[in-house]
Amino acid sequence: MTPSVDSLLLGAAAAAAVVLGLGWLAHRVLLLGLKAPRVPHDCGPHDLGLPAASVRELSIAGMRGKRLFAWLVTPDVATAAPHPAVLVMHGWGSNAAMMLPVVAPLREAGFSVLLLDARCHGRSDDEDFASMPRFAEDIAAGLGVLRAQPGVDPGRIGLIGHSVGAAATLLHASRDPAVRAVVSISAFAHPGELMRAWLSRARIPYPVIGWAILRHVERTIGARFAAIAPLATVRRVGCPVLLVHGRHDATVPFSDAERLAAAAPHATLLAVDGDHDLRDALAPFTDELVAFLIAATRAPALADA
């Protein structure tokens, strides 16, 4: 869960600014700016001491013929069917291995866990660019496979995401009423606000130049920031949402989490003493996170309650 949001903003803003004068060539530069640095896995589920039979590597069919890498971790046979499952999505410039701290507690609680590499990340296929909507597309592809796994109850599925991955889980859940729970870790409230703050720090004036940069990024990713912003999508999510955020987050301010909590009809805010990368800071709250997912996937769906 390494924070790399600034690299996304830097690449997008710098490249898009050039687009204003250099056309096609500069647009190609923008696409490079919208690709995160690929970080290789430095560990895997087997390093957690799990039984070999409980871990499988999957190759999942994604959009536009791309293949997505994933690890599927299953619970003990005694609790294997039927049981809930969770898809876990990393953040920008990260990969599935960096989300491993949540795996063992979830497996012990009887969940199957799908750890997914988004396109342009980890061991998944490359693409012309990465974006939050494309993260959401990859989540949809992963869920299709997860729901079809033997023993998995397709009606008891939760999502966990970090940073851009958290925003993507909220975007997907706002469109998929079958999702039963979302754990959003270090999500930003609005991508446009995040980029405008970066433009201000870089002393790029918003009128004309900054505005044009943001509009070009929207055209490139095929979505308006206002439509995909967590501040908008969290209002449309019909399942319980746990918003986890570090009080000392220097990448996405804690106030973003407070705004999301105020906007969400079924949200709970969990504040932890940490920064944007919460792998270590989350350890004391693992039981709370697992309890939330157990309650949400056991209870009747909110839409049916």
Q: Where on the chain are the PLM-derived regions?
A:
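Alpha/beta-hydrolase fold nucleophile elbow
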Residues: 151-162
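Conserved alpha/beta-hydrolase "acid-adjacent" motif
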Residues: 250-256, 281
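Alpha/beta-hydrolase active-site loop
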Residues: 129-150
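An N-terminal hydrophobic leader/cap segment in hydrolases
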Residues: 2-61, 71
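Conserved alpha/beta-hydrolase
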Residues: 103-125
